[in-house]
Regions:
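Bacterial Sec-dependent N-terminal signal peptides
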Residues: 1-21
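Glycan-recognition and catalytic cores of secretory/periplasmic carbohydrate-active enzymes
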Residues: 18-200
Length: 200
């Protein structure tokens, strides 16, 4: 008990001692993104990671993290209001636009909300809203009302017929958002049913 009290008393001091210079971190992020943009002008692929030789490993837009790179660009634009970041964010967001019709993944929330969602939030571009609504429709096709869950992946070797992983929960925001924006309660109902059944 004495240890818990000591930890409770010292925790605020430890947190205070670890202040982060947010401006410095954003400057570093800007430098890293500028390097990536210079090294990877091809928007037909998504930047995955840096190799030891300074080149980049790329993935197709259907990769589940494809929205993170444009999402980061939108965050830089939000912080700086620098038009170069908005231009880059729009370019890389457009690169994942075709995924709005992707019915083969449960990760559309990651892919589309980070890119188009941040773009819509910051620019109010009505085209971004349309893309997000279509993305929600595509995600909703993975829901089986008889099972009451959104399927993570299509069947694959290993015997799983209807695989469902916890990560699906992180994509439900797209469905809640679409329900609110369109007035269609079916998106919300799918999200709630999936969440309730995931808890079982």
């Amino acid at each position: 008990m004495k240890n818990l009290i000591l930890i409770a008393l010292l925790a605020p001091i430890a947190v205070f001692a670890q202040k982060i210079d947010v401006n410095k971190q954003f400057k570093l992020a800007e430098q890293q993104y500028q390097r990536m943009l210079a090294a990877q002008p091809d928007t037909s692929v998504t930047v995955h990671s840096a190799n030891h030789d300074g080149t980049y490993r790329n993935m197709p837009s259907k990769w589940w993290c494809s929205g993170f790179f444009p999402g980061g660009l939108w965050q830089l634009y939000e912080r700086s209001h620098n038009a170069q970041w908005e231009k880059a964010a729009r370019l890389w967001t457009a690169a994942v636009k075709k995924e709005q019709y992707n019915t083969g993944t449960h990760d559309l929330g990651f892919m589309m909300f980070d890119s188009f969602g941040n773009g819509l939030r910051l620019t109010k571009d009505p085209e971004y809203k349309k893309v997000l609504i279509q993305s929600a429709k595509s995600l909703a096709t993975r829901f089986d009302p008889n099972i009451g869950l959104i399927k993570s992946w299509n069947s694959f070797k290993g015997g799983y017929k209807y695989p469902v992983i916890i990560d699906n929960m992180m994509n439900l925001d797209l469905l809640f958002w679409a329900s609110k924006e369109t007035g269609d309660p079916s998106f919300k109902q799918i999200a709630l049913t999936h969440a309730d059944n995931t808890m079982k």
